[in-house]
A protein has these predicted regions:
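Pair of pore-lining "gating" transmembrane helices in MFS-fold secondary transporters
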Residues: 10-37, 111, 220-236
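Residue-level signature of mid-helix packing/kink "hotspots" within the transmembrane helices
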Residues: 32, 59-68, 152, 267-271, ...
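Extracytoplasmic gate region of multi-pass secondary transporters
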Residues: 34-35, 221-264, 271
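Helix-breaking motifs and short loop linkers at transmembrane-helix boundaries and internal kinks
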Residues: 46, 78, 99-104, 133, ...
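Conserved MFS/SLC helix-loop-helix module at the cytosolic interface between two early adjacent transmembrane helices
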Residues: 65-104
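Hydrophobic core of transmembrane alpha-helices in multi-pass small-molecule transporters
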Residues: 105-119
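Intracellular juxtamembrane helix-capping segments at the cytosolic ends
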Residues: 119-132
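Helix-loop-helix hairpin linking two adjacent transmembrane segments in secondary transporters
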Residues: 134-135, 142-191
Length: 291
């Protein structure tokens, strides 16, 4: 494997692509596990819903800060190093988040995971688009489908470990190991084009997907409409994942373990939608699919 896959509508599923998919899915594992654990963490810390919601605020704020820094970090360090540092920061954040040291520690851990996670997602997405060429949109949808599958499993795992008295932290501790193992596997890929893993080659045409060149012209109006739609979808998704378990405990009388596991209904729907979306992305234009 010495060059990018031949451009086409169907993604080229080689080893580095699968590793990248898996790394994105591991972040999704935490993301949806984060929502499932919020009510459990609030019970443990004895805080109100208002105080517990600080975790969501910190997560969002850290996302914004990291998102502003990522382009410069990719320019300076390259994609490979950004992914490596992101995995390290995320693993450290999970360890701090799950440490029984009270609210300050869980907030700090949340910020670290958010910074590492958004850095991992942005950099891995840029790599996939660059590496897969015209199959990039379909590849991203495939990656999101696999991530949704992990998101479907994590509430069930957290609910099961809570019911078995193993504690909700067990699944997140296993996630740390999985993150480090996948990064070790990625770093040991001898035939991966280093320029594409580190910093994409500067193309002659700035319109190439995932390129490292910069076009400082204003974004078209269609971009801002698309960004607005994605923002609304993300707001809906985070509202469901963060508060569904707590709402089911209050309104439906579910126990902590059952409420955490029930979040799988939300993430399972996302998984089915992304499976269908990955097929449609191979046949329809991206703007039509978004509509």
């Amino acid at each position: 494997m010495t060059a990018s896959p031949t451009p086409g509508r169907r993604p080229h599923l080689d080893r580095i692509t699968w590793i990248t998919y898996l790394q994105l899915s591991l972040f999704a594992f935490f993301l949806y596990g984060f929502g499932a654990t919020q009510a459990l963490l609030r019970d443990e810390q004895g805080t109100s819903r208002t105080i517990a919601s600080l975790h969501a605020i910190v997560f969002a704020a850290a996302n914004v800060v990291a998102g502003l820094l990522i382009p410069r970090l990719m320019e300076r360090w390259g994609r490979g190093r950004v992914i490596r540092y992101a995995v390290i920061v995320m693993s450290l954040g999970i360890a701090v988040y799950t440490a029984p040291f009270g609210l300050p520690a869980s907030l700090i851990g949340t910020a670290l995971v958010s910074c590492g996670g958004v850095s991992l997602v942005a950099t891995a997405n840029a790599f996939i688009l660059d590496y897969q060429g015209s199959a990039g949109p379909a590849a991203l949808t495939q990656a999101n489908a696999l991530a949704a599958l992990f998101g479907f499993l994590v509430p069930l795992i957290i609910g099961l470990t809570t019911a078995l008295a193993w504690g909700w932290r067990t699944g997140l501790w296993a996630l740390i190991v999985a993150l480090l193992v996948t990064e070790l596997l990625r770093s040991r890929q001898p035939h991966t084009p280093r320029l594409q893993l580190a910093q994409g080659p500067r193309p002659q045409h700035p319109t190439t997907a995932g390129c490292s060149g910069h076009d400082h012209s204003p974004m078209p109006r269609r971009f801002w409409w698309s960004l607005g739609v994605v923002g609304l979808l993300l707001a809906t998704e985070f509202t469901l994942t963060l508060w569904s378990a707590d709402l089911l405990r209050e309104r439906a009388g579910l126990g902590p373990a059952a409420a955490a596991a029930s979040l799988a209904a939300v993430t399972g729907g996302m998984f089915l939608g992304r499976i269908v979306g990955s097929r449609l992305a191979q046949r329809w234009r991206v703007d039509r699919l978004l509509v």
